[in-house]
């Protein structure tokens, strides 16, 4: 399989699918009331965009339903930044993914529903035997739903390919979500299904070119 760039999903692909829902979401939810009473201008500007009376309740509802809301994603990035910086959060990136990102012969890009800010934090504070590891120097660029669109729409992948200056058929996209892979494939991208512990079982997984370890790439 020849490709000129790799586009990676995060949750369920380079780190356990449980990390977001069992670590990041609970950390954020504990800060919702404090967030809503914050006098920070950036936070207030984001909160007013919800245009609802019960902002805290609305935020909790979005998180509970795992809604990919762009305003919510930006707020989460701001809250998680504090958690990463004070050592309360470390990202459990798979060892084989770390090795692949560090040693890839082609540019590595990230595409996640989480904000670009949250993505950079995750890769800046990767859990390792020596405290934390910063993978940002090895990652060429980041894309999210604000910059590129929803991950289940083919137009999003066309935008990314155009942005990186590589034809879609020269990009390999790896994700645990078959709907995302279907969307990417429409543009001509090469695709692989990430099969990791805890991921949902995918019907007809073989047709999605499954990979269980990035050492096999």
From Swiss-Prot:
UniProt subcellular location: Cytoplasm; Nucleus
Gene Ontology, cellular component aspect: cytoplasm; nucleus
Cofactor: Mg(2+)
Keywords attached to this entry: Amino-acid biosynthesis, Cytoplasm, Hydrolase, Magnesium, Metal-binding, Methionine biosynthesis, Nucleus
Binding site for substrate: 112-113, 151
Known catalytic reactions: 5-methylsulfanyl-2,3-dioxopentyl phosphate + H2O = 1,2-dihydroxy-5-(methylsulfanyl)pent-1-en-3-one + phosphate
Signal peptide per UniProt: none
GO biological process: L-methionine salvage from methylthioadenosine
Chain positions recorded as Mg(2+) binding sites: 9, 11, 176
Pathway(s) this gene product operates in, as recorded in its UniProt entry: Amino-acid biosynthesis; L-methionine biosynthesis via salvage pathway; L-methionine from S-methyl-5-thio-alpha-D-ribose 1-phosphate: step 3/6; Amino-acid biosynthesis; L-methionine biosynthesis via salvage pathway; L-methionine from S-methyl-5-thio-alpha-D-ribose 1-phosphate: step 4/6
Pfam families referenced in this protein's UniProt entry, alphabetically: Hydrolase
Primary location group: cytoplasm
Cofactor binding, note field: Binds 1 Mg(2+) ion per subunit.
EC number: 3.1.3.77
GO molecular function: acireductone synthase activity; magnesium ion binding
UniProt function note: Bifunctional enzyme that catalyzes the enolization of 2,3-diketo-5-methylthiopentyl-1-phosphate (DK-MTP-1-P) into the intermediate 2-hydroxy-3-keto-5-methylthiopentenyl-1-phosphate (HK-MTPenyl-1-P), which is then dephosphorylated to form the acireductone 1,2-dihydroxy-3-keto-5-methylthiopentene (DHK-MTPene).
Oligomeric form and interacting partners: Monomer.
Family per similarity comment: Belongs to the HAD-like hydrolase superfamily. MasA/MtnC family.
NCBIfam families linked: enolase-ppase
Protein name, UniProt field: Enolase-phosphatase E1
Species this protein is from: Lachancea thermotolerans (strain ATCC 56472 / CBS 6340 / NRRL Y-8284) (Yeast)
Taxonomic path: Eukaryota, Fungi, Dikarya, Ascomycota, Saccharomycotina
